[in-house]
């Protein structure tokens, strides 16, 4: 399926020369050269299939592939996620003159980043969000009020994955100018940039477009935060997404309740979208050239409940003010309670540290420790099940040998 007539290349999908060596090595491991495979990027994952994007003769092509585990660069089998680069081959007997053949992913290229979030259930492992993300955009509405705790948790996830993080404030036209200024000037710690796209003066996604230009950006936020509205605005420059009909909507949006600003889950699965290229632009149009080179957006479903990351170092990075005071404590294992020489308690006493922020830090650290313990217990159970299964198989083999011997 051809997406649109344009001058597309792999670079349009976020590829750059540093990936080339990994692709060549993966092809060699599979027993061929790069010319024997199609290099594609996973744009969506459904229950039974993947959607892949690649290019052919300057056109962006959408491919379909059955859902199956693929070997990664460690020789282990796992399922590709949105944002992954994969080597594929067409499946014989599929496709037609008007429809590309189905493809079979054979290898996943090494990931530069792997964004995950803890599962809301006790027994599940971390849930993948996207791979090879350069920047995480936290989309947070100004109405009824931004959740600092939620922003801090998203920020910690970004730090755990090694990606930059930006806070994008939406629905600023529903609060006073003073409130918007306050939200913009006093964000949660750890974010690299704070932008507001919606004010009394209109909806302006240009600062976000400039921020994500040439990068792969993932958008996370609660349901009704305005993620899909923002993505539509980035995909359709000059069109106000609040007043637009569904004619220009790539991502369908829905209304939110006036009482609490909450909405239904509009985006039901993660989807990777390519920012429009500079079609028809002149060679000297450097602005369009920059915006068309590898700018990729990943829209995600709204998150109702977000657990803390199990990476305590990422939490310390998010709460760098708290961890800075903690490093000055007399004892390295200080619990920041009643120990003598506690620099954190001193900062709380003299007003240098916000008590509410410190309490959020304590809760996240405690939750993180419980998640690590739960993960260890889960790994132990899995290992024990594998050990028991191997023992049973061994006993069956031994009994069959004894039976034959008799």
Language-model segment annotations:
Residues 1-8, 15, 33-36, 72-85, ...:
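Helix-rich effector regions associated with P-loop NTPase G domains
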Residues 36-48:
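Structural detector for short beta-strands of small beta-barrel domains
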Residues 50-55, 88, 105:
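SH3/SH3-like beta-barrel fold
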Residues 59-79:
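Beta-strand/loop nucleic-acid-binding surfaces
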Residues 137-142, 168-170:
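Conserved beta-strand segments of the P-loop GTPase G domain that flank and frequently precede/overlap
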Residues 149-160:
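Histidine-anchored nucleotide/phosphate-binding helix
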Residues 164, 171-225:
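Canonical P-loop GTPase G-domain recognition
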Residues 223, 228, 233:
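Walker A/P-loop
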